[in-house]
UniProtKB/Swiss-Prot annotation:
ATP binds at residue 132. GO terms for biological process: inosine salvage; nicotinamide riboside biosynthetic process; nicotinic acid riboside biosynthetic process; nucleotide metabolic process. Allosterically activated by ATP. ATP binding is a prerequisite to magnesium and substrate binding. ATP binds to 2 of the subunits in the homotetramer inducing a closure of these 2 subunits and the release of the C-terminal loop, thereby activating the enzyme. The keyword Nucleotidyltransferase does not apply. The gene is ISN1. IMP binds at residues 180, 182, 188, 216, 402, 410. This is IMP-specific 5'-nucleotidase 1.
Length: 485
């Protein structure tokens, strides 16, 4: 019963990515029809009664079957690649003429699919991942979610590398790479130690004159917040300070965006550490227009609602949980030695997201769409948006062991970095503008609609990883391809 529950729970629609699931469905057909010699070959019957001869016959056909499967899979990825290119063309036409009403074939098939800022060489990426994961050689396990996720990641890296190789210094190329913190750069709740393998990769990217940003939910305002971020990134910051691989200009290309999009820090050579950047130097116009009283009201109402949920689920004992309220975020965290049930975390993040919809509907100058999104990934973040300039973006998300509500989201965090860096006169605007197609966000929270890192898809190309080890692997690939220029 427990095993069945876990399987069914994991397969809930709100935990799926529709685009990946759709590709999985396409790949299931050739797997069923071509991945087993018995499915299309009758010669096996001659050897069926002799187990040894039958086994030898199957082994003799392994290569042929794998090649057939690979070709079938390649055909599918080639077709999906064309659909992505068509979607990019239609999106560009709509950007030029908003009255253009045609919808791309891909968006008709997968309505929830987001925008693609670069073409995706999926066929090439599939061959790369097939050589690593032996997808075509499998007979009992069909192409999986992680297979498709890895192929999409590799395709994005290949696309950015090709753009980088084809450009000159002032042309369109990869300029900014941002990262989530927990589970992406370091283990959940941990920090970057001096021996972390990802540090070498980050230093190499900085030495290539790329901007590196850490866009994290952890929010510590002001210069007084520097020690907390230093504690999280100590290994990297110490290495940047002392390494001869970087010049002073490159050292200051490290930035940290805290609280999703609320607090900006930058490495400063004089400080030898991070320096807090005042909001008026980097806030986007939409963020500057937000009413502080309205923000306080959102925080106060959410605080009250969290206390209600804390009491409702009997989490209000002093040894169980604590509600922490900051300037632009509020959350409920477990006390040492206690663990909040996964179901309670999901209930709380769903409840908070719905409460936020109500709050924003009451406070917005223009009515907020009250339709709750069809797919809510309660293990991730739920973000609310409206076209109105005064509408405050709010993000409710599950950090894995706690639940937080932040003002802003990572789409604003990444976009703020893009705009802020172009204000720096020392770059003589050679890097400007930093386009969405020239930015890459790497994170672990992309499942379904409204997730924490999911929002970064609005402002940059993305890579979906599942562990710091995967981050190192994808950066190795990226550096290798960029260095081939």
């Amino acid at each position: 019963m427990t095993s069945r529950y876990r399987v069914e729970y994991a397969l809930k629609s709100h935990r799926r990515d529709e685009f990946i699931e759709w590709i999985k469905g396409l790949l299931a057909v050739p797997f069923v029809l071509h991945a087993d010699v018995e499915n299309y070959d009758t010669d096996f019957m001659k050897h069926y009664e002799d187990p040894e001869a039958y086994e030898d016959y199957l082994l003799s056909r392994e290569y042929e079957i794998a090649l057939e499967c690979q070709n079938r899979y390649k055909e599918i990825f080639a077709d999906v690649e064309k659909l992505v290119n068509h979607a990019i063309i239609i999106d560009k036409l709509q950007d030029k003429n908003p009255t253009y009403v045609d919808t791309s074939r891909l968006r008709k098939l997968v309505p929830s699919v987001g925008r693609f800022f670069t073409p995706l060489p999926l066929t090439e990426a599939f061959l790369v991942e097939d050589s690593r994961r032996s997808i075509s050689k499998r007979r009992l396990v069909s192409p999986s979610f992680n297979d498709v996720r890895s192929i999409l990641n590799t395709a994005q890296v290949l696309a950015l590398a090709k753009m980088y190789q084809d450009s000159d210094e002032s042309g369109s190329r990869l300029k900014l790479i941002t990262f989530d913190g927990d589970v992406t750069l370091y283990a959940d709740g941990s920090s970057l130690t001096p021996d972390a393998p990802v540090i070498d990769k980050l230093i190499k990217l900085l030495s290539m004159n790329l901007f590196i940003g850490v866009v994290t939910a952890a929010g510590y305002p002001g210069q007084s917040g520097v020690p907390q971020y230093y504690e999280r990134l100590k290994g990297l910051i110490d290495r940047i300070r002392t390494t001869p691989e970087l010049n002073d200009h490159q050292r200051e290309n490290l930035l940290v965006m805290g609280g999703e999009s609320n607090y900006l820090f930058r490495y400063d050579n004089e400080f030898g550490n991070l320096k807090f950047i005042e909001a008026d130097e980097w806030y986007l116009p939409i963020m500057s227009s937000w009413d502080k009283l309205k923000i306080d009201y959102i925080m106060s109402t959410t605080d009250k609602h969290l206390k209600h949920l804390q009491k409702k689920f009997k989490l209000d004992d002093m040894d169980k949980t604590t509600i922490i309220r900051k300037e632009r975020s509020i959350g409920i965290i477990p006390n040492p030695g206690y663990r909040i049930l996964r179901e309670h975390l999901e209930e709380m993040v769903l409840s908070c997201s719905m409460k936020l919809q109500e709050i924003l509907a009451r406070t917005a100058r223009t009515p907020v769409n009250m339709e709750i999104v069809n797919q809510l990934d309660t293990s991730q973040a739920v973000s609310t948006q409206n076209a109105a300039d005064d509408h405050i973006k709010v993000c409710a998300f599950n950090g894995g062991s706690d639940v937080w509500v932040d003002i802003g989201d990572k789409s604003l965090g990444v976009e703020s970095l893009q705009k802020y860096l172009c204000k720096d006169v020392k770059y003589e605007h050679k890097v400007c503008p930093i386009l969405k197609s020239e930015s890459l966000h790497i994170g672990d929270q992309f499942a379904s609609l409204g997730a924490n890192d999911f929002k970064a898809r609005l402002s940059a190309c993305t890579v979906w990883i599942a562990s710091p080890r995967e981050t190192v692997a994808i950066l190795e690939d990226l550096i290798q391809h960029l260095s081939n220029k």
